[in-house]
Curated annotation (Swiss-Prot):
UniProt key word Ribosomal protein: no
InterPro entries reported in the protein's UniProt record: SAUR_fam (IPR003676)
Homology family: Belongs to the ARG7 family.
GO BP: ethylene-activated signaling pathway; response to auxin
Source domain of life: Eukaryota
The protein's role, per its UniProt record: May be involved in the regulation of ethylene receptor signaling. Promotes cell expansion and plant growth.
Alphabetic keyword roster: Developmental protein, Ethylene signaling pathway, Growth regulation
Phylogenetic lineage: Eukaryota, Viridiplantae, Streptophyta, Embryophyta, Tracheophyta
Coiled coil: none
Protein name in the entry: Auxin-responsive protein SAUR77
Record's miscellaneous remark: Plants silencing SAUR77 exhibit increased sensitivity to ethylene, while plants over-expressing SAUR77 display reduced ethylene sensitivity. Plants over-expressing SAUR77 exhibit increased rosette diameters.
Organism: Arabidopsis thaliana
Length: 131
């Protein structure tokens, strides 16, 4: 959830921009802070989840995870409307998606012996998470 903390800081910095335009020095400090926050987040991608299309900023590491890839494959079967090729839509309830993110964050993929078992469960988990 550290991503959301960074986004909150960036959002508050952007909100302060108009009020600081009178003081050029403060504006420059705020602008440089916002730019540094954005550069830290360059590895993030927007993913829209659920029927409400709630946006999430996910790292490439999460998007490359086999479970997330399976979820995307299954979601493409349910979602017919694609406005452009860069839009990533996931057919999953928001609450379940947040649980999935929590699982991915807290899982340890250092277990070499469990790879076969994990591959088999990826399909089952993706089936559970999609509508």
């Amino acid at each position: 959830m550290a991503i959301f903390g960074k986004l909150t800081k960036l959002k508050s910095a952007i909100k302060k921009w108009p009020s600081l335009t009178k003081n050029h020095h403060s504006t420059m400090c705020t602008a440089s802070t916002a730019v540094s926050e954005v550069s830290k987040c360059e590895d993030l991608h927007v993913v829209y989840v659920g029927k409400s299309r709630r946006p999430y900023m996910l790292s490439s590491h999460v998007i490359a995870h086999p479970l997330f890839q399976e979820l995307l494959d299954r979601s493409s079967r349910f979602i017919e409307e694609r406005h452009d090729q860069e839009t990533v839509l996931v057919a999953c309830e928001v609450v379940l998606f947040e649980h999935l993110l929590w699982m991915l964050k807290n899982s340890s993929s250092d277990h070499g012996d469990e790879d076969d078992r994990e591959r088999g469960s990826v399909e089952e988990l993706a089936e559970f998470y999609t509508y």
